[in-house]
Amino acid sequence: MDKKITGLKLFLLLFWQVSFAQQTILTDSNLPIMVISTDIDPATNSPIDIPDEPKVLATMQLIFRPDGARNYLTDITNDSFLNYNGRMGIELRGSSSQELDKKPYGFTTLLEDNDSNNNVSLLGMPSENDWVLNSLAYDPSMIRDYLSYTLASNMGNYAPRVKYIEVIVNDDYKGVYILTEKIKRDSDRVNLKKIDDEDTDFPEVTGGVHH
């Protein structure tokens, strides 16, 4: 019995050491670094977990040296290297991908009142408030979505603009994501006119739309 207990202790110790060794602590990167800190839950005095919905409030800093130099986590206190430093609402997105360790997120940039949308340009993309953090969890190469969106855009079709970034959530390094424009009607995204109630026939309505 003692040998079994000793063997179990040894296994747990080795498992803990391997797991600890596999944890990555990000200090710098040639990619922009997004740091997300959810608000503190007064009931637990700990950061709020990010749910499927609704969005929870958080603060986000996006570290990006405009000259293209390497980005450092210590730059988080230097306004000159912060592409964004403000409030956000964030939630999980996706379906089966939510079950993976590396989860996808959707977020809205907010004004300081924690309610009003804040249209901002992130990493040179047109100003908006709805964004996606694509975890690339089902694509080990981490290039499929980036390549398909970029090729479609270069061919003259609309496709979401994308930027590779590093993501840290509540001091936990999550890995490489692509910051992506959320697909929506907008002059800089899907540039479609809003349909009015009286728009029921061609040419206002096309493409097999039924009422």
Residues of each region from the PLM?
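Bacterial Sec-dependent N-terminal signal peptides
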Residues: 1-23
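Phosphate/dinucleotide-binding and metal-coordinating scaffold of catalytic cores
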Residues: 22-211
